[in-house]
């Protein structure tokens, strides 16, 4: 086992604080509408330019191991805030630095670290409750656009695009961000349920100009098996032909004789048919077939539950207003499934999301909810260069997370004002002893840090602005973009409550642990020169055998 280097007390805390400051100072220059960019060197390709706090934090590793431990713990704050709310990483880092700096001063002055931590925790718990009372629901498109704009670093077009996307696919719909091809941002919306399986034969195409199959008011046959024998399908085909409607077959596969017969029937105009493979694999395929059945009011023909294809009737088939199939995708528009059944299915999938352990599973389940509940919107980010594209895409993703958080828990006044109001309301909060009171004061003073940093990044004097904002009440604050005072909500400067709450909670959690640290242990660096010397000595000993 390698030898260890151990530091105690003040020596350890000084080193740790130095690491915290290096990371936080690099991250906090990005805060606010006039925050600066940070350039990150990459081992290959062009450097990345970013204004995203967590991207900067993730790049930082320090040579001194004790300092690095401090930096890594604050990096954890940014990552946690990012995971919880998708934004607010810079705010969380600034809060953590402020609490740690003030807290370590109090420890150096002889306060009990455990009581300081209890005081900080008490102040933060009270602050979270206050934030909830200040929170205003965020439901209209205008507020959503404002939140998106602020999170995308005051880019109004991004805010409007996100609001439009949410408007089209609903709060539950999936919104994804992709690289665009032009210079302008674009929004593509797919309504209805779309899955990534195309037609099994190009002979099904009935719209040659678009290369697609379009079926109006079709019946939909869902089968959890391979279909290769046409005899199994004859009763259903005859019933559909009598009804005079087209038929869409979604099965594990349709092959051989069955596929050939369907193609011939379609080309002769006897019955209009199209066949596609079912989406997904294994258990996920079964689940997605069931989703389609719920959406279209049909039944999955599955041998597992004792159903046979030959005995299927028109009642077992689903229906939709329209189906569009191209080479790679199938879209079912306006399924006739009952609303109550669809909502029940959505609630069931939501329960699975709660219990899911892997991010991949959670993401796939979320997609299924969106396909059932709303639709899918794709924001295509346009930019002139690849470097700009990466930077802009990161901003759009941040803005998307922030708007989701805003819809979930509401919004508070932005620009650091909400925390200032919370701190002033908690001015009379007291702990069980004087050391806890100091901890409470440390946390309340730290709540001013985000506003001060935003102002500092504007090139203004933080103390003057902070005192002016403290002198006002309600949503009165400082608009750093225009450098004027006023009502933050009216000026459209909003922060999602969830983002502010998560930033404060994670910052206080890690800061509390660091304030109560008394000892740090790390591996001693290996001394390569000493190792080489030892090897040389051993070689000399080999020669001694000849002397005896």
From Swiss-Prot:
InterPro entries registered for this protein in UniProt: Chaperonin_Cpn60_CS, Cpn60/GroEL, Cpn60/GroEL/TCP-1, GroEL-like_apical_dom_sf, GROEL-like_equatorial_sf, TCP-1-like_intermed_sf
The yes or no answer to whether the keyword Transport is present is no
Q: Which GO terms describe its molecular function?
A: ATP binding; ATP-dependent protein folding chaperone; isomerase activity; unfolded protein binding
Check the record and name the PANTHER family matching this protein: 60 KDA HEAT SHOCK PROTEIN, MITOCHONDRIAL
Assembly state and interactors? Forms a cylinder of 14 subunits composed of two heptameric rings stacked back-to-back. Interacts with the co-chaperonin GroES.
The entry's family comment says: Belongs to the chaperonin (HSP60) family.
- Per its record, how is this protein called by name? Chaperonin GroEL
């Amino acid at each position: 086992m390698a030898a260890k280097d151990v530091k105690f007390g003040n020596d350890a805390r000084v080193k740790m604080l130095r690491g915290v400051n290096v990371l936080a100072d690099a991250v906090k220059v990005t805060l606010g509408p006039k925050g600066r960019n940070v350039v990150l060197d990459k081992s290959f390709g062009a450097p990345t330019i970013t204004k995203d706090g967590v991207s900067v934090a993730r790049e930082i590793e320090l040579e001194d191991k004790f300092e690095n431990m401090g930096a890594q713990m604050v990096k954890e704050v940014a990552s946690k805030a990012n995971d919880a709310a998708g934004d607010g990483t810079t705010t969380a880092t600034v809060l953590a630095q402020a609490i740690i700096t003030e807290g370590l001063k109090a420890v150096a002055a002889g306060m009990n670290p455990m009581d300081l931590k209890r005081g900080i925790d008490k102040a933060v718990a009270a602050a979270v409750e206050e934030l909830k009372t200040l929170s205003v629901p965020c439901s209209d498109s205008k507020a959503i656009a404002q939140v998106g704009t602020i999170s995308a670093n005051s880019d109004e077009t991004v805010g409007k695009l996100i609001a439009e996307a949410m408007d089209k696919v609903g709060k539950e719909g999936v919104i994804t961000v992709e690289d665009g091809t032009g210079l302008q941002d674009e929004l593509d919306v797919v309504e209805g349920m779309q899955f990534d399986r195309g037609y099994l034969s190009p002979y099904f195409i009935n719209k040659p100009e678009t290369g697609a199959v379009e079926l109006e008011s079709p019946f939909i046959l869902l089968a959890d098996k391979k279909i290769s024998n046409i005899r199994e399908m004859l009763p259903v085909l005859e019933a559909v032909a009598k009804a005079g409607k087209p038929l869409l077959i979604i099965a594990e596969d349709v092959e051989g004789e069955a596929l050939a017969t369907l193609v011939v029937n379609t080309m002769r105009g006897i019955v209009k048919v199209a066949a596609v493979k079912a989406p997904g694999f294994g258990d996920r395929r079964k689940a997605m077939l069931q989703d389609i059945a719920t959406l279209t009011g049909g039944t999955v023909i599955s041998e597992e539950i004792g159903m046979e294809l030959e005995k299927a009737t028109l009642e077992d088939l689903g229906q939709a207003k329209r189906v569009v199939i191209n080479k790679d995708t199938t879209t079912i528009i306006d399924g006739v499934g009952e609303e109550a059944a669809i909502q029940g299915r959505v609630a069931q999938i939501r329960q699975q999301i709660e219990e899911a352990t892997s991010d991949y599973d959670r993401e796939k389940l979320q997609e299924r909810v969106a396909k059932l509940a709303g639709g899918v919107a794709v924001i295509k980010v346009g930019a002139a260069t690849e470097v700009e594209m990466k930077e802009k895409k990161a901003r759009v993703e941040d803005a998307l997370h922030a708007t989701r958080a805003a819809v979930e828990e509401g919004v508070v006044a932005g620009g650091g004002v909400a925390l200032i109001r919370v701190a002033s309301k908690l001015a009379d909060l007291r702990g069980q002893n004087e050391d806890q009171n100091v901890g409470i004061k440390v946390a309340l003073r730290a709540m001013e840090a985000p506003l001060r940093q935003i102002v500092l990044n504007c090139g203004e004097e933080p103390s003057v602005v902070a005192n002016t904002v403290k002198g006002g009440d309600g949503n009165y604050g400082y608009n750093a973009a225009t450098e004027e005072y006023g009502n933050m909500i009216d000026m459209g400067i909003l922060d999602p409550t969830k983002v502010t709450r998560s930033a404060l909670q994670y910052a206080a959690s890690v800061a509390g642990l660091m304030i109560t640290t008394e000892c740090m242990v790390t591996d001693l660096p290996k001394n390569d020169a000493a190792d080489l010397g030892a090897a040389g000595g051993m070689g000399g000993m080999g020669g001694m055998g000849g002397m005896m």
